[in-house]
Amino acid sequence: MKVVELPGFQRGFAKLPKHLQEKTWYQLHTFLEHVGSPVKPKSLRLKKLPFGNFEVSINMDLRILFQLHGDALILVLLGDHEDVRRYLRR
């Protein structure tokens, strides 16, 4: 699967401390291992959101907002719950 990072994700990722960057890649790797599987690990806290968006939790405060288009995983945003809500309101 091809992974595409949009600027909103890149900005959020650059602001994170090293340990959260590592946790972010770990969660993405875990998600990619289970794409197409009917069972996803509960630790991902995967949610389907409006407009073809999905959300995966990094920790209790941090979320990845993404979209799936064919064989591409589009990483849209990395931020807290309020950042995700603001993005979805647009």
Region annotations inferred by a language model:
Residues 4, 8, 14, 39, ...:
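Basic nucleic-acid-binding interfaces
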Residues 2-4, 11-15, 21, 56-90:
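Enriched for short, Lys/Arg-rich terminal
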Residues 30-56:
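A short, surface-exposed loop/turn module that caps and links secondary-structure elements
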